Amino acid sequence: MNPNLAKVLLIDRDQERRNERISVLKQHGYKVFPALDLQQARSRCKPGAFDLIVVNSGGQPDMALELCEWIKSNDSKQAVLLIAATGNQLPHRDYIVSDVPKQLLDRIESLFKGVEVAVKAA
């Protein structure tokens, strides 16, 4: 997928990290839409509105997992990437452990490559 066309919802309460992640993703052509809290995230999560939703657990893994499950229950095809402090006991396949921006970018690009392959194979 062309990053210039990809819309990413970034849910992150930590202003410094959020700004850093937004900057890196925008530099690589992604359209980034920040959500600062759970309420704002839920109001923006409409089926098909985003190509990817990135959720930072921000020290609240239970709340982040609940949000991921809520997103998937509303749109089972929605790609969701969870950023967590630790990967222990996470039921999700698509997560990274407390990232640095390069790791986040690499993971997002690999997710979109997987989407392209799936679309081409269909």
Residue ranges and their predicted role:
Residues 36-52:
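Acidic, metal-coordinating helix/loop segments flanking the phosphotransfer/catalytic sites
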Residues 1-17, 87-89, 100-122:
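Non-catalytic signal-transmission and effector/linker regions of two-component phosphorelay proteins
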Residues 14-17, 39, 55-62:
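Short acidic, S/G/P-rich loop/turn micro-motifs used as interaction or catalytic elements
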Residues 54-73, 77:
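Conserved phosphotransfer microenvironments
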Residues 77-90, 98:
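A short, hydrophobic beta-strand element within the central beta-sheet of small alpha/beta folds
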Residues 15-33:
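Two-component/phosphorelay signaling modules centered on CheY-like receiver
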Residues 51, 93-94:
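Conserved acidic residues
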